[in-house]
């Protein structure tokens, strides 16, 4: 008996590909939200913490790229994994940003958003552990 879960594909066939595509659309939508105009100068915002790492428009590009990689990954496994890792890295930076904003008083309830992002990040790691949809699997 083993102490760990067996490594096997979580998503198979078109059903799995549809689930991955839905996740990708969410990631792309978040990227599009950040690609818009910046917040007015002097407006207190969590984005001030995140903007110290990279400008908001760049975060938009990162999220859109991750989402497109996940979409492409429904057919090419390596891209699926790369997209999820890129998304997980971006999400981790935003979690840290919200925690820093909470500690510094910029966003006293920022920890709530950080905690809300956490389950998505946990899902990404679970998907990475269990594996991408198998290549050539057309059964649904």
Go through the PLM ranges and name each one.
Residues 19-20, 79-87:
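Membrane-interfacial loop-to-transmembrane alpha-helix junctions, especially the N-terminal start
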Residues 17-57:
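Hydrophobic transmembrane helix segments
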Residues 67-82:
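Juxtamembrane helix-break-helix junctions at the cytosolic face
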Residues 54-63, 110-120:
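Alpha-helical transmembrane segments of polytopic membrane proteins
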Residues 63-70, 92-98, 120-121:
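Hydrophobic, membrane-inserted alpha-helices
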Residues 1-27:
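Cytosolic juxtamembrane helix and N-cap/initiation of the first transmembrane helix
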Residues 119-140:
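Membrane-water interface at the C-terminal end of transmembrane alpha helices
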Residues 78, 85, 92-114:
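Membrane-helix boundary connector in multi-pass membrane proteins
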